[in-house]
C-alpha cells in the first residue's frame, strides 16, 4: 500500500481508497455477454479527464462547459445532478496543439476529505466546497497567488489529504509543494524551488517515516508532509511538460517511476539511517515507458501500458531488477484497476476488459466496447459498480 493514511470507503481521490488503484471488491464476474456488463445508467458530461469520486450515494467530478468549469455532485444510483459549482475558466495560456486536439477540460482528480470536496481546474483554480451542498468554503488561485506555472497542457496533479492538510504540487519559487489547512485554506507550509510537472504526488512510509513523493520537472523528490522539509532528491531528466504518470511506492522502500517519449522506467531504493534517507537507483530501462496512465504493483511485478502516441503494450516488469516479464499488444493505451484477483482494463478507444495477470502473461476473460475514443480517465470501482467516463459521457456498470 502506497498511502500512509487509513483506507476510506468509496473512492475518495486519485488512486482510490488506498491510493494504489487496488480495491477489495469481491464477486466480480469472470465473463460477460457480447454486449458487456449491465449498464445501470449513462448521461452526458462535459469535457475533461478528472476521475470520479464515490461517497455513499454521491459521485463528484469536474468538467468543462464552454469557458466554464463545473464541479458537480451526482446521484450514484441515477446519475442525476444534485448540485454544481461553476466558475470562469478561460484558458490563461495558449495550449499547444496536442492539448487542443485532446481537450481543454480539467485533468486533476478532486479529493474528498472531512466533509469537503477539493477540486483543482486547468488553470490551477482550487476550490474547497462542502460536499453536501457545493457551498464554497475557501479558494486559492495557484497560478495568480503562488506563481504556479500554467503549463501548455494545463494543471494535472491531484491533491492529497494528510492529517488535516491538503497537499499540492504547485511549482515555482518557494512553492514546489504546499500544504493548506483543510478547514480554512490557510497556508501551513510552502517550500522549495523545483519546477513542477503533470504528475500527481503520493504518500509512502519509509522505515517508519511518512514521506510525500513528487515527480518534478527534472527531479523526483521526497519531503516531510508535516513541514515540507526536503528529505531527498534524484534526477530523472525528462522535461516536466512530458512527465505525467504517478510514481508507485511500496512497503519495501522501492519507488518505481516511468515516463514516455524519450524517458523510461527506473527503480529507486529508499532507506533511512540516523534520521537520513538515502536513495539508490537500482536500474533504468527504456523497455517500459508509461505515458499518462496508471501503474499497479502486485508482488514483484509492476504492470502498466507502455507507449505514448504510437503502439501501446501492456507490460509487466520485475521491480527489483528491471527485467521485462512480458509484453502484450492486446489493447490500445490503457488504465488499470485491480480487484478480485483481476484487472479491470479500460483502453483509450473505450474497450473495457477483465483480465487475470500472472508472471507468464495476461489472460483476457471478457471484453466489450462501451465508449468511444478517447478514454484516458481511470475508472472508479466501489463494490461491483464501475463508474467510467470519456470526454462526453459517464456510465455506471454492474460488474457482478
Task: Show the residue positions of the predicted features.
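Short loop/turn segments that connect beta-strands within beta-propeller blades
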Residues: 75-78, 130-133, 181-184, 224-227, ...
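WD40 beta-propeller blade core
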Residues: 72, 127, 178, 221-222, ...
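Extracytoplasmic beta-rich repeat domains
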Residues: 40-53, 84-111, 139-161, 171-174, ...
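Short loop/turn segments immediately following the C-termini of beta-strands
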Residues: 16-19, 64-66, 122, 171-172, ...
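Short coil/turn segments that connect the beta-strands within blades of beta-propeller domains
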Residues: 56-57, 114-115, 163-164, 208-210, ...
Amino acid at each position: 500500500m502506497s498511502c500512509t493514511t487509513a483506507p476510506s470507503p468509496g473512492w475518495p481521490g486519485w488512486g482510490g481508497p488506498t491510493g494504489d488503484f487496488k480495491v477489495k471488491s469481491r464477486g466480480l464476474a469472470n465473463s460477460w455477454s457480447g454486449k458487456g456488463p449491465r449498464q445501470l445508467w449513462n448521461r452526458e458530461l462535459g469535457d475533461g479527464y478528472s476521475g470520479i469520486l464515490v461517497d455513499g450515494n454521491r459521485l463528484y467530478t469536474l468538467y468543462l462547459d464552454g469557458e466554464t468549469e463545473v464541479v458537480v455532485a451526482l446521484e450514484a444510483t441515477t446519475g442525476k445532478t444534485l448540485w454544481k459549482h461553476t466558475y470562469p475558466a478561460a484558458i490563461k495560456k495558449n495550449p499547444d496543439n496536442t492539448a487542443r486536439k485532446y481537450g481543454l477540460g480539467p485533468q486533476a482528480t478532486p479529493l474528498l476529505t472531512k466533509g469537503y470536496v477539493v477540486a483543482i481546474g486547468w488553470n490551477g483554480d482550487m476550490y474547497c466546497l462542502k460536499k453536501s451542498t457545493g457551498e464554497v468554503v475557501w479558494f486559492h488561485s495557484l497560478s495568480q497567488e503562488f506563481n504556479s506555472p500554467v503549463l501548455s497542457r494545463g494543471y494535472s496533479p491531484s491533491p492529497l489529504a494528510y492529517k488535516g492538510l491538503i497537499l499540492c504540487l504547485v511549482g515555482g519559487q518557494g512553492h514546489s509543494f504546499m500544504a493548506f489547512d483543510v478547514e480554512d485554506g490557510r497556508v501551513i507550509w510552502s517550500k522549495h524551488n523545483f519546477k513542477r510537472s503533470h504528475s500527481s504526488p503520493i504518500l509512502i512510509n519509509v522505515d517508519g517515516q511518512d514521506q510525500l513523493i513528487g515527480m518534478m520537472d527534472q527531479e523526483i523528490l521526497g519531503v516531510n508532509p508535516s513541514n515540507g522539509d526536503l528529505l531527498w532528491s534524484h534526477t530523472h531528466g525528462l522535461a516536466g511538460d512530458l512527465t505525467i504518470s504517478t510514481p508507485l511506492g511500496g512497503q519495501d522502500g522501492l519507488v518505481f517511476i516511468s515516463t514516455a517519449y524519450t524517458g523510461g522506467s527506473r527503480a529507486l531504493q529508499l532507506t533511512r539511517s540516523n534520521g537520513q534517507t538515502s536513495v539508490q537507483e537500482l536500474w533504468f530501462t527504456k523497455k517500459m515507458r508509461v505515458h499518462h496512465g496508471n501503474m499497479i504493483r502486485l508482488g514483484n511485478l509492476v504492470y502498466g501500458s507502455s507507449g505514448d502516441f504510437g503502439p501501446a503494450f501492456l507490460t509487466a516488469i520485475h521491480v527489483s531488477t528491471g527485467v521485462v516479464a512480458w509484453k502484450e499488444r492486446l489493447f490500445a493505451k490503457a488504465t488499470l484497476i485491480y480487484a478480485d484477483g483481476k484487472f479491470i482494463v479500460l483502453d483509450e478507444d473505450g474497450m473495457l476488459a477483465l483480465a487475470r495477470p500472472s508472471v507468464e502473461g495476461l489472460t483476457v476473460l471478457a471484453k466489450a466496447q462501451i465508449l468511444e475514443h478517447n478514454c484516458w480517465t481511470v475508472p472508479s470501482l466501489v463494490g461491483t459498480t464501475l463508474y467510467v467516463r470519456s470526454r462526453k459521457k459517464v456510465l455506471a456498470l454492474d460488474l457482478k
